[in-house]
Amino acid sequence: MSVTFPSSGCPSFFNIFYEEGIVMKLTIYYDGQFWVGVVEVVDNGKLRAFRHLFGKEPRDSEVLEFVHNQLLNMMAQAEQEGVRLQGRRQKKINPKRLQRQVSKELKNAGVTSKAQEAIKLELEARKQKKKQIMKEQREHVKEQRYMLKKQKAKKKHRGK
């Protein structure tokens, strides 16, 4: 398979996303027990990050299946608004510099601190939502028990 790069040294789809202000990056690393994929999405100066647990080492087909089928659902279910990024827009990157940056990224296996912060915010939002749902369920069950108790008391005194 051959990939054709434009004269700027970047894949053409990257330029489209960069002009729109959207950049996505998938990092897959081994955390000591499982293989984890972290998707970082930069959209209009805000970073959102999503964590996906692959389990055993993913094959290329599994990664593609995740990107094509599960990634959009995971992004749609997210409730976080993202972490504001500070910085300016980059200019066109020299192809040699881009190649050095790519090799540096490949050596640096891990997640950025901003991505970790975004994942933490998403986790906190989910916790709060689940806590609220559980509280409503407990109150509903408590109300049902109270009504049943009232019914039994009325039934008991009805015959006198």
Swiss-Prot record:
Protein's organism: Bacillus subtilis (strain 168)
Biased composition (Basic and acidic residues): 133-146
Region (Disordered): 82-109, 129-160
Recorded coiled-coil stretches: 69-145
Swiss-Prot/TrEMBL keywords: Coiled coil
Pfam families: DUF2992 (PF11208)
Gene disruption phenotype: Deletion of this gene has no effect on mannose utilization.
Name of the protein described by the UniProt record: Uncharacterized protein YjdF
Inducing factors: Up-regulated by mannose. Is under the control of ManR. Is subject to carbon catabolite repression (CCR) by glucose. Forms part of an operon with manP and manA.
Compositional bias annotation for Basic residues: 86-99, 147-160
Taxonomic lineage of the native organism: Bacteria, Bacillati, Bacillota, Bacilli, Bacillales
